[in-house]
Amino acid sequence: AAWLVTSHNWALSALEIAQIACLPERYWLTFQTSFDSLALQQKCATHERYVQYLTILEADYPQRLLETHCPPTVLFYRGDLSVLKQPCVAVVGARQATEYTKQALQHLLGLPQTTTIISGLAQGADAMAHEVALQKGLRPIGVIGTGLNCYYPPQNEHLQQAVAEKGLLISEYGLDVTAKKHHFPARNRIIAGLCHSLVVTEARQKSGSLITANLALQANRNVYALPGQVNHSLSAGCNQLILAGATPLLNQQLLLDELHYFD
């Protein structure tokens, strides 16, 4: 609510906001005390100085994300917002991704430089996707489950900074918010919502990558899975997706043909 009021210069009281939001009356006083607090005002001022943000009511809010279930009310970002208007491929996969993922991405991501690659900046497949995108001159979009000034995992700090400089870094969490377990499924819905197509590289049979793939399917996105060895645990999730109807990603041309529709 604070970001919406600040962004649009609305002259709304805390009580009016609580009523608009249909907040139960027993919580009104607590909400008003928090909303009018000096701490919240200082936090908003700090964000105004150090990051940019976009609310769900603004014209630049990504239309693809707006059409999904439960879009974030506010997106904090660093970088170039215009990359959201380019054809976008999401890449997700195992944190323990093998050399197979890296080799496949080197082959598959030789895409037009108008293409953006979106992932979650986690260890493994996410980091590999961003690294290959940067090597090939594609614009990266990183969606993280922390504040923009936090790094998780810590070893991805330089990569996260490169993504913000060369593309776009996004979070629905304010500054100084550290990683929590439930942040990552929430982050995955943003990845699924922003992309045109989603690629799963390697994934176990019970994997967060499969949750992201299902979210992408619910948002009417095209889902591709990299076929793998039948006796390898990191291929079980992808092979299961293919069995359920995902397109096997056998060559680069499949992605090129798909992206042609979004130019």
Language model regions located:
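Short, small/acidic-rich helices and loops at N termini and domain boundaries
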Residues: 1-59
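Glycine-biased, small-residue-rich flexible motifs in mid-sequence functional cores and linkers
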Residues: 56-263
